[in-house]
Amino acid sequence: MTLAFGDWIVHRRWYAGRSRELVSAEPAVVTPLRDDLDHILLDVTYTDGTVERYQLVVRWADSPVAGFGEAATIGTALGPQGERIAYDALFDPDAARHLLRLVDASATVADLRFTREPGATLPLYAPPKVSSAEQSNTSVIFGKDAMLKVFRRVTPGINPDIELNRVLAQAGNRHVARLLGSFETSWAGPGTDRCALGMVTAFAANSAEGWDMATASAREMFADVVGSDFADESYRLGNAVASVHATLAEALGTSTEPFPVDTVLARLQSAARSAPELAGRAAAVEERYRRLDGRAITVQRVHGDLHLGQVLRTPDDWLLIDFEGEPGQPLDERRRPDSPLRDVAGVLRSFEYAAYQKLVELAPEQDADGRLADRARNWVDRNSAAFCAGYAAVAGDDPRRDGDVLAAYELDKAVYEAAYEARFRPSWLPIPMRSIDRILG
């Protein structure tokens, strides 16, 4: 196959290798799905010797096909039948429906295994459309009923998004979109580690992202608009998160472990190299962590990367989505049990971002008297308290009761955010730095 995958993949939003220099992008496994459709596992090699594997579904055509934009056009390749054009098949409605039919049939194609969940009904005739919201994966929405998420960068092991959604669906938890199906392969041929490739879930039609709702409330609060309070929704969100935690604990169990002091210290040291602003606070943060050395905490399976962008408000309730865990971590690490307080801390940090992101866009003289900063702080405090109260109403235990542990998880998250902002969005660095100072007191 002479297709220049490397020239195309580096411009995709889901490509994770931008910080490294690409050497080659070559197909490792090619599985024909039909005459004009190939499933491809692409190995991308970098100058540092590392290799990442990406998943593509390629639609072949002898001449240009209307409807495919530049982003969906991979290139041309010379084969036995002459020159052909390759397209990203997820943008082709007929090809997307073919994938859904394979899931519906629980089909096996070579080493590709498709599975429909028991009792699931898939909308085989609904019109498909690629979602514009994804970053690391590609999702195709079928009408108002289902969403096919295709993982782009794939790794061996059990995928936590499929795993936890299956557990929650089987338990009947109403705070997740029901898992309808999935597909996988073997990493290095039959008998080797499994490798998740994608999943189908019920689509949350007419839903709103929690981040959009919270930031809209915060903007209205700054403008003195009546009705800007978000606390009732924060309370219900706390209910939902506690419900998911309770289901996971009951289904998969809990255990007791020491607070992960070494893990958070390693993250602090790494972050300090990216954000010099942390240097003057590193000793105080470390001291906070070391206070918890040897402290026993209850751990279980959790979401692992929870924030307001990972929750959807439907007309009926809150849903938690994307149980993949912390981006960039190996699958085994993402599946490691952790304290439910990590998820709680993620939501609390997200409240701070929702309130303060407007402030960082203002010139200092626009809030010279600190009035807007006070409003932001009050908004965060009110919504954080409502969320924790809602969580406690379902869990029977207020997460603020273990305040020093919760604060440590908030610090860990803020330290990570500081490193990220210093590298990619320096104008937002004051948000996590302000939080670190507040937590340290």
UniProtKB/Swiss-Prot annotation:
It comes from the Bacteria. Pathway: Glycan biosynthesis; glycogen biosynthesis. Its EC number is 2.7.1.175. It is an enzyme of class 2 (transferase). It catalyses: D-maltose + ATP = alpha-maltose 1-phosphate + ADP + H(+). Gene3D superfamilies: 3.90.1200.10. One of its GO terms (biological process) is glycogen biosynthetic process. GO terms for molecular function: ATP binding; kinase activity. Catalyzes the ATP-dependent phosphorylation of maltose to maltose 1-phosphate. Is involved in a branched alpha-glucan biosynthetic pathway from trehalose, together with TreS, GlgE and GlgB. Belongs to the aminoglycoside phosphotransferase family. This is Maltokinase. The lineage of its organism: Bacteria, Bacillati, Actinomycetota, Actinomycetes, Mycobacteriales.
